[in-house]
Amino acid sequence: MRFLLILFLALPTICSANAIWGKTGHRVTGQIAEKHLTRKAKKAINKLLDGHSLAFVSTYADEIKSDRAYSSYSPWHYVNYALGTRYQDAPKSEFGDIVMAIETCTNVLKNPNSSQEDKIFHLKLLVHFIGDLHQPMHAGRSADKGGNDIQLQWFDQGTNLHRVWDSNLIDYYNMGYVELANELDRSIDKKERKQLQQGDVYDWLDESHEFAATIYSSVEVGEKLGYSYAYEYNGLVFSQLQKGGFRLAKVLNDIFS
C-alpha cells in the first residue's frame, strides 16, 4: 500500500482527457487479473480468446455500443439506486443492470451446454463489467445518470463527474496501462490480495455505491477540478483498479475451476 502514497507525491503536471474504467482503467484491471489466474483458468480463457489477453478484450463491451444490434446491453454497464441504501433492497430495472449482467455472463460460462460463441461473447463482457463494478459512478444516482449530468471542468477542459472518474483521474497520472498495472500489482502482498478478494458481487457493488456518495459530496456543479482533487482522490482510483483486477481473477478462477 506504500506505493499509493508515492503516487500522490509523483503526480505529473501534464494531463490528458483523450481516453474514453475508460480504456486505460479497464486494461489495467484485465492486466492485473491475468497475473493471478490459476493454470486451469488461464488455459480455458486462452482457448476462448484465441490467445488474446484480458486487457485486450476488456474494452469490447464499450466498443459494441456503436452497433444498434447490441443496444439492449447498454443498461448492463451500471446500476443506479438511492444513496445510503443497499442494492438488494433497491427496485430492479426490467432492462437489467450490472449485477444481472455479471450473473448472466457467469451462468453462460459455467453452463456446459453453452455454445463456444456464447462463451466467448460473455467472457469479454464479464471482463468489462467487473471493471465497471469498481468505478463508483457506475453505481451512482438515477437523477444525474451516474454523474453524467453533473458538468464540471477538469483543469481547463469541460467534463462531467462520470468522466472524471472514468478517465480524467487515471489519464492525469500519464502512465501506460501495463506500467500502471504492474505498479499496482506489486504494491500488494498475497495476504492483502486475499483480503481484497473477500465478499461477492453484491458486497463489491455496495462498496462502490458508498464511495459514490462521498464523490457526489466532493464537488459542486460547474466546479473547476485540478491538482488538489487529483491528489485527494487518485488513491481511491488506484485502489479500485487493484480490487477490480484481483476480484476479476477470483471470479474467473471460480468459473473455470
Indicate residue ranges for each PLM-predicted region.
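Bacterial Sec-dependent N-terminal signal peptides
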Residues: 1-24, 257
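N-terminal, motif-rich segments that launch catalysis or mediate targeting to/interaction with membranes
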Residues: 18-127, 136, 141-257
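Short, functionally critical alpha-helical segments immediately adjacent to catalytic or ligand/cofactor-binding
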Residues: 130
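Acidic beta-to-alpha connecting loop that harbors the catalytic carboxylate
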Residues: 133
